[in-house]
């Protein structure tokens, strides 16, 4: 089934990359302000991250929402765990927690 292949891909990406951002567009060409904001935060922190464009495949985008149980994008994963979207990433950045999570 395609869903299983998508879930397998997602699991593989978050397992094999310390930081993954499922986003609208790419880090070089963001396609929404929320994705751009998270990219800017990660860049300010000097973090290398894997970016995955959710616009490439509508079925993948829907499967990712099911996988994460999170309805919106971007979705930031650190060390295999969903951190959240733009608002949560921004809040964690502003209070210093995001940097701690990334260094730990």
Swiss-Prot record:
Origin species: Rickettsia felis (strain ATCC VR-1525 / URRWXCal2)
Any one GO molecular function term: metal ion binding
Protein name: Probable monothiol glutaredoxin 2
UniProt binding sites for [2Fe-2S] cluster: 32
Domain Glutaredoxin: 7-104
SUPFAM superfamilies (UniProt xref): Thioredoxin-like (SSF52833)
Keywords: 2Fe-2S, Iron, Iron-sulfur, Metal-binding, Redox-active center
Recorded family membership: Belongs to the glutaredoxin family. Monothiol subfamily.
Pfam families: Glutaredoxin (PF00462)
Binding site for glutathione: 24, 61, 73, 86-87
InterPro entries from the UniProt entry: Glutaredoxin (IPR002109), GRX_PICOT-like (IPR033658), Monothiol_GRX (IPR014434), Monothiol_GRX-rel (IPR004480), Thioredoxin-like_sf (IPR036249)
């Amino acid at each position: 089934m395609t869903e299983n292949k998508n879930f397998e891909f997602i699991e593989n990406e978050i397992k094999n990359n310390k930081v993954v951002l499922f986003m609208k567009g790419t880090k070089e060409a963001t396609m929404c302000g929320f994705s751009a904001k998270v990219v800017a935060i990660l860049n300010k922190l000097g973090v290398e991250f894997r970016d995955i464009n959710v616009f490439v495949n509508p079925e993948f985008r829907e499967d990712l929402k099911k996988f994460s149980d999170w309805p919106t994008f971007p979705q930031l994963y650190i060390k295999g765990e969903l951190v959240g979207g733009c608002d949560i990433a921004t809040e964690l950045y502003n209070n210093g927690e995001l940097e701690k999570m990334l260094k730990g």
